[in-house]
Swiss-Prot record:
GO terms for biological process: cell wall organization; peptidoglycan biosynthetic process; regulation of cell shape; response to antibiotic. It is a multi-pass membrane protein. This is Undecaprenyl-diphosphatase. Keywords: Antibiotic resistance, Cell inner membrane, Cell membrane, Cell shape, Cell wall biogenesis/degradation, Hydrolase, Membrane, Peptidoglycan synthesis, Transmembrane, Transmembrane helix. Bacitracin is thought to be involved in the inhibition of peptidoglycan synthesis by sequestering undecaprenyl diphosphate, thereby reducing the pool of lipid carrier available. Its EC number is 3.6.1.27. The chain crosses the membrane at residues 42-62, 82-102, 108-128, 143-163, 181-201, 221-241, 248-264. The keyword Transmembrane applies. The gene is uppP. Belongs to the UppP family. It comes from Nitratidesulfovibrio vulgaris (strain DP4) (Desulfovibrio vulgaris). It catalyses: di-trans,octa-cis-undecaprenyl diphosphate + H2O = di-trans,octa-cis-undecaprenyl phosphate + phosphate + H(+).
Length: 265
């Protein structure tokens, strides 16, 4: 299989799974093993193509991000208030991630821990879906500092590889009273600062693995990741109000043993 096809397949997997509550880490592990693309360079590539997925969310929610710099009258999720909410959401995982980065890389990327994270995240989703309380927060403009910080605390669960940042923040938001669609939308927007920072940090530490000859390979993965993430987020937002997350949870339980197998053997 050519390098460009490998890059395109991995970019497609990254884009389709990064913002869905299914764990992009688990899927990239399986795909990388099937394609025979593993090791330090593969890990760096997987980090780099996340930038394509991040850019897709920036494009889709450009008006919201632009509003953070140029607030509009009667829009509360804008300007300094909007920036403050995103900072509150990013703070817990940023602090914990920086403090425990080496430990996470060394001890939480084992076959058993990633597979368990997939299963625990699935059970968490099923439990949240059993709740029947009416949501208290309906739109982004109703977001409160307490809700933003609470979602940020749940986001710390995503530091456990395999748990899924989207699962942690969407389910955490719903548990704290956010409407299903709001929890998903805010999860995508809040992903940009923390993912950009984490991706940048990892790339700075591994930039020596890049060579000019790798540029077409990385560019292919980046572009495919961008396009597939754009389509996945667009479709997910259109459907999220009419569906539950139970199918995602059962799917995670099904692939957890596969992730363990491909990582262990």
């Amino acid at each position: 299989m050519s390098d460009m096809i490998t890059a395109a397949i991995l970019g497609l997997v990254e884009g389709l799974t990064e913002f869905l509550p299914v764990s992009s880490t688990g899927h990239l592990i399986i795909t990388g093993e099937l394609l025979g693309f593993t090791g330090p360079k593969a890990a760096t590539f997987e980090v780099a193509i996340q930038l394509g997925a991040i850019l897709a969310v920036v494009v889709l929610y450009w008006d919201r991000f632009w509003g953070l710099l140029r607030p509009q009258p009667y829009v509360r999720f804008a300007g300094l208030r909007g920036i403050m909410l995103l900072l509150l959401t990013s703070l817990p995982a940023s602090v914990l991630g920086l403090a425990a980065h080496s430990t996470i890389k060394a001890h939480l990327f084992t076959p058993s821990t990633v597979a368990i994270a997939l299963a625990v995240g699935a059970i968490f989703m099923l439990l949240v879906e059993r709740r029947t309380e009416r949501p208290r927060y309906m739109t982004l403009d109703e977001m409160s500092p307490a809700l933003a910080l609470g979602i940020g605390c749940f986001q710390c669960l995503a530091l456990w590889p395999g748990f899924s940042r989207s699962a942690a923040t969407i389910m955490g938001g719903m548990l704290l009273g956010a409407r299903r669609g709001l929890a998903a939308e805010y999860s995508f927007i809040a992903a940009v600062p923390i993912m950009f920072a984490a991706t940048g940090y990892d790339l700075l530490k591994s930039w020596t693995l890049f060579t000019p000859a790798d540029l077409p390979f990385f560019a292919t993965g980046f572009v495919v990741s961008f396009l597939s993430a754009w389509a996945a987020v667009k479709l997910f937002i259109a459907l999220v109000g009419r569906m539950t997350f139970r199918p995602f949870a059962w799917y995670r339980l099904a692939i957890a043993p596969l992730v363990y197998y491909f990582m262990a053997y």
